[in-house]
């Protein structure tokens, strides 16, 4: 029997206050908010992100901002305005950019969003000391399409990430039919 009690649930794609209230009732401790700088569904502009993140703070729910800004300056402005507890960045940043973020936002947790087509272990090792968490997305979003990989296809990459000794959250394409298999095969943090 699989024990899922140690798996932490993080729900992403939150776009409304009602969803935050439901999450609080269900005792979900972490919610992800996708910036409209990302491709894909369920995104919000910075003003809405700020409001939703403030509401999360009232419920003591960790707010994770998923962003795709490619310049450090744009990302700093977005973090300063929306004030998330955690940021999930795309692959665009150098080690020095993360050092700048750590210097400016001392309490900010930094996550890296990874997908099966953008996996570079050498890069991930080089920034690992500055990163708090990895978010591995089985989905790849383009303007008009979502391509989903199975966790089994990505198992080797996920296991390589686990060797970096950071929490790993797996998302995208997870549903009631495959959740147990994903957990059993990859043993993620959440």
Can you annotate each of these PLM segments?
Residues 1-14:
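N-terminal amphipathic alpha-helix/helix-capping segment at the start of soluble metabolic enzymes
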Residues 12, 167-190:
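C-terminal active-site rim and adjoining tail of enzyme catalytic domains
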Residues 17-21:
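Short N-terminal binding/cap micro-motifs at the start of the first secondary-structure element
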Residues 22-28:
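A short, Lys/Arg-enriched amphipathic alpha-helix followed by its capping loop at the start of a domain
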Residues 23, 87, 182:
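Conserved, mostly hydrophobic/aromatic
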Residues 30-48:
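Glycine-rich, proline-tolerant flexible connector loops at the mouths of alpha/beta enzymes
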Residues 34-39, 55-178:
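Conserved anion-binding
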Residues 52:
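Aromatic/hydrophobic pocket-lining residues that form π-stacking "cages" and hydrophobic walls in ligand
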């Amino acid at each position: 029997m699989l024990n899922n009690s140690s798996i932490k649930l993080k729900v992403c794609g939150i776009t409304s206050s009602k969803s935050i209230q439901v999450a609080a009732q269900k005792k979900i401790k972490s919610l992800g908010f996708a910036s409209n700088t990302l491709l894909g569904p369920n995104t919000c502009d910075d003003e809405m992100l700020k409001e939703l993140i403030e509401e999360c703070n009232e419920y003591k729910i960790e707010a994770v901002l998923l962003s795709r800004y490619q310049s450090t300056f744009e990302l700093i402005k977005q973090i300063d305005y929306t004030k998330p507890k955690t940021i999930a960045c795309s692959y665009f940043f150098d080690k020095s950019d993360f050092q700048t973020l750590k210097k400016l936002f001392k309490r900010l947790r930094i996550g890296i969003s990874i997908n099966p087509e953008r996996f570079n272990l050498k890069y991930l090792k080089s920034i690992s000391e500055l990163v708090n968490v990895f978010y591995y997305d089985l989905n790849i979003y383009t303007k008009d399409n979502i391509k989903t990989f199975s966790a089994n296809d990505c198992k080797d990459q996920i296991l390589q990430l686990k060797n970096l000794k950071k929490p790993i959250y797996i998302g995208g394409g997870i549903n009631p039919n495959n959740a147990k298999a994903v957990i059993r095969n990859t043993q993620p943090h959440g």
